[in-house]
Amino acid sequence: MKKIRTGMTLAAAVALAVGMNPFGSLPGSRVCAEDGTTAAKEVTLRVCNWEEYIDLGDWDEEETIDLESGDIIGENSMVEDFEQWYYETYGVKVKVEYSTFGTNEDLYNMLTLGDVYDIVCPSEYMIMKLMAEDKLVPLSEHFFDTSDENNYYSKGVSPYIRNIFEKNEINGEAWSKYAAGYMWGLTGIVYNPEEVSEEDASSWKILDNPDYKRQVTIKDNVRDSYFAAVGALKSDLLTSESFRNDPDYKQKLVDEMNDTSPETIQAVQDYLQDVKNNAYSFETDSGKADMITGKVLANYQWSGDAVYTMDQAEEDGVFLDYAVPEESTNIYFDGWVMLKSVIGEDKDKQKAAEAFINFNSRPDNAIRNMYYIGYTSVISGGDDPRVFEYADWNYGAEDGEEDTVDYDLAYFFTEDGNSEDYVITAPAEQARRQLYAQYPDADAMDRSSIMIYFDEKQ
């Protein structure tokens, strides 16, 4: 099994944060021709993304991803490669000014205080908030034209993810009208199987389980902690056979997990006080290190960070597992949206912004980003096999390995979820470790729920 790369050089991070090109000049990036006239119109594209959430390049040669369909390596940053690709493809120079943010609330405050960006990458609930506030520009009709070879997103987004973006609405408008997915995952529990049973880790009730007093962490934000608390409080209902077998199970699950009745809010407050008395900490990022160093035995985590945690612990000889709670799990997304206040009617900017989405959705680039940051792209690749090849490259069993499991990913890669072409023969342990975190199985997906956007009245 190959390792997911994490981290970046300080120089590259600082350079991108201030809009510099950390790798020098690009061919064709000069705005003046030799005679002193303008060689081509230049578009400035201001992008704001999560910290450490895009490939910065500068890979070592031994990091080459050698797939059946060809090698992939990040020599330059994704931003640099996009600038060059855009000029070669459209004959127009684009200069990307790349910035980062730490939380969705940080991004929203930056926008409120007047920071100017054309395209940003918030999580699903912030996308819903920006939609509700009428702050976004809809994606163009051309963006969805699959006959255009450069529309990599529409051609390659996972059918499973596309369906979610088309079904979920704000004010009668689908997410897909305004947002294109980037990364996705589920929330769950990273745990030490030497100290914590799989059964205990597979329930949100582990958070206040006295057997793990001061040995478990929970997320320090209202949405994630509220979701976990509702799951724990309604555990008996959510895991009951009658509830699971209800013909309207998925909708009823969403309704239960998004219950904001006064009674439920009070019960959640009381429950979280119990969790506070039991947990090691409420945290945003420190839980990864606490698991790796053994300070805690279980950590409420986003799946991408769960992969990082398991990878890093494994380097120290500690093998951690990942569980998706039986009650329900939150399926989350980060996605690209364009801001009305900046792009407005500027078609040149919109074309560049949509091209940036498409370039990051090209299968080889989706793989580069996944390798570099450890999260899972919404891109399955369509007719391009490389994303599945990459999953197999990462997690497929070695020849002759005996203790294996057939891990079915057809739900993610196909329209109907029924194909034998998307089964990975993986080491058996991967059914509860990195593969399970990065590509949860169909059972985990079935009990996943969107957490809707709550307006100020809620």
Spans of features found by a protein language model:
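Sec-dependent signal peptide cleavage junction
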Residues: 20-38
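Early extracytoplasmic/lumenal segment of secretory-pathway proteins
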Residues: 35-133
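Periplasmic-binding protein-like
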Residues: 145-152, 266-273, 317-340
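Ligand-binding pocket segment of bilobal, Venus flytrap-like solute-binding proteins
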Residues: 218, 225-229, 238-321
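Mature extracytoplasmic/periplasmic domains
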Residues: 338-426
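Conserved C-terminal helix/tail region of periplasmic/extracytoplasmic solute-binding proteins
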Residues: 410-458
